[in-house]
Design a protein with these regions (language model features):
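Extended interfacial segments that mediate partner engagement and assembly in macromolecular machines
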Residues: 53-65, 71-182
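Short beta-strand micro-motifs enriched in acidic
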Residues: 30, 39-43, 127-131, 188-190, ...
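Terminal RNA-binding accessory module
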Residues: 1-69, 338
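Residue-level signal for inorganic ion chemistry
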Residues: 18, 33, 76, 394, ...
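Hydrophobic beta-strand signal
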Residues: 37-39, 125, 290
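Internal alpha/beta scaffold segment
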Residues: 148-183, 189-193, 202-227
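Rossmann-like S-adenosyl-L-methionine
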Residues: 6, 12, 203-449
């Protein structure tokens, strides 16, 4: 059944939101302020889902998608929306999370951190599938809401030279003896070279290896192989094992990593984010700082250039070992210490055992830092870090943890804002600042009063 809708807003799945007698209608393919005709494709008691068939009144924020696969490929969902409007939607999602979950408003909204809208994705997991009906191998992202692989020959969010490899990769995989036993290729773009991690379910032949080597020479890539679980990951040639690194030039740091290590997808934004976090923390040279969920030391090492001591804590000993090596390479080993701990199961006694921290940076995965927030809330006022900067990749868990820090721990939210780490997607990265005992208080909503 087709109906006409006026779109009020957009959700993070890029669906326009309309209302009919108070019931939410999520309209795929529609943008705010548009009037569209759409088919209802699903009915639920509390909402309905519709798909746009025609646009009666078009939004001034609608733009022509750059990618020919947009609409089919699940890698991007907002290419049809002006980039400024994309950021505004993410900012609203952040503010809504604080209001509805944390029961507070943001007293000072930080200007959004933005970088290039295209060619920014330096990490990617590409699916591979041999499609007999099409007579070819597909290499790309999954189709939206599907397990099928998009039939794509270019990708504008990947660096251009990686996009240019999509068709040659198809041809390469199609030439291998196990062309139907390769489910994915992970891409990790470093400063000097690009690593391709090939997941293969059966052994490669000598001829296959020759093919990989020839591709490596033509495209300046290094191959890594994974035959089973994560512990089977290895470089095709051992002498290339240490070729990946990224630079943090404002701190004079070179950060080595492996293709399976977590690094930020967007190098441009990562540099801006580190600088912003350090500026907000305002660390003094006599202060002791904690960096929780420190990973490879992405924040730890820059912090060590200004602090008296930085303690980096992470759940993976592999990552903390690499962080320690990087600190030593930059003569920062005297100012850094690393510990391997499960930060999802910490308590206040654990926190006290680490000693007092003047400042703290928290950069958790999507699950957030619930246990850490609870532990901080139980500290006495004199034991607390005076300032916390929280970097988040999930506005819901950030808001949950913020509620604990503010309503139970006596902290004040002083500022928060979005970081557009993933343009053209619904992913919301953000940064928030909390202060103990001073600073502008977050304004509680009526529900929290």
């Amino acid at each position: 059944m087709q109906e006409t809708f006026t779109i009020e807003s957009l959700d993070l799945e890029a669906r326009g939101i309309a209302r009919r007698e108070g019931k939410a209608i999520f309209v795929e393919g529609a943008l705010p302020a548009e009037k569209v005709r759409a088919d209802i494709v699903r009915r639920k008691p509390s909402y309905e889902i519709a798909r746009t068939t025609s646009i009666i009144k078009e939004s001034s924020q609608r733009v022509t998608p750059r990618c020919p696969s947009f609409g089919t490929c699940g890698g991007c969902i907002m290419q049809h929306l002006d980039i400024t409007a994309q950021v505004a939607i993410k900012q609203r999602a952040l503010e809504d999370g604080f209001r509805h979950i944390a029961k507070m408003t943001i007293p000072r909204v930080l200007p959004p951190l933005q970088g290039p809208a295209w060619g920014y994705r330096y990490r990617a997991r590409l699916s591979v599938r041999k499609v007999i009906k099409k007579g070819k191998v597909l290499v790309g992202f999954h189709e939206r809401k599907s397990r099928y692989v998009t039939d794509m020959t270019e990708c504008h969010v990947l660096p251009p030279y990686v996009s240019d490899m999509l068709v040659p990769l198809r041809e390469l995989i199609g030439s291998l003896s196990i062309d139907d036993k390769i489910p994915q290729i992970e891409v990790a773009v470093g400063e000097a070279t690009t690593a391709l991690l090939l997941r293969h379910l059966e052994p490669l032949t000598a001829v296959d290896i020759e093919q990989l080597d020839a591709f490596s020479t033509r495209h300046n890539v290094v191959w890594w192989l994974q035959s089973k679980g994560p512990d089977t990951v290895r470089p095709l040639h051992e002498e290339q094992a240490d070729s990946l690194y990224y630079l943090l030039p404002q701190f004079g740091l070179k950060m080595p990593y492996k293709p399976t290590d977590f690094t930020q997808v967007n190098y441009f934004i990562n540099r801006s984010l580190i600088a912003k976090a350090l500026n907000l923390l305002d660390v003094q040279d006599d202060e002791r700082v904690a960096d929780l969920f420190c990973g490879l030391g992405n924040f730890t090492l820059p912090l060590a250039t200004v602090a008296r001591e930085v303690v980096g804590i992470e759940g993976s000993s592999i990552l903390t070992d690499r962080a320690l090596q990087a600190a030593s390479q930059h003569n920062l080993q005297e100012k850094t210490r690393f510990a391997t701990l499960n930060l999802f199961e910490v308590d206040v006694a654990w926190l006290r055992n680490l000693g007092h921290f003047d400042r703290m940076l928290i950069d958790p995965p999507r699950e957030g830092a619930h246990a850490v927030a609870l532990a901080l809330a139980q500290l006495e006022p004199q034991e607390r870090p005076t300032r916390i900067v929280y970097v988040s990749c999930n506005p819901a868990t950030l808001a949950r943890d913020a509620g604990i820090l503010v309503h139970e721990g006596g902290y004040k939210l002083s500022a928060a804002g979005v970081v557009n780490m993933f343009p053209h997607t619904g992913h919301v990265e953000s940064i928030a600042v909390f202060e103990s005992g001073s600073g502008d208080a977050a304004k509680p909503t009526a529900a929290a009063q």
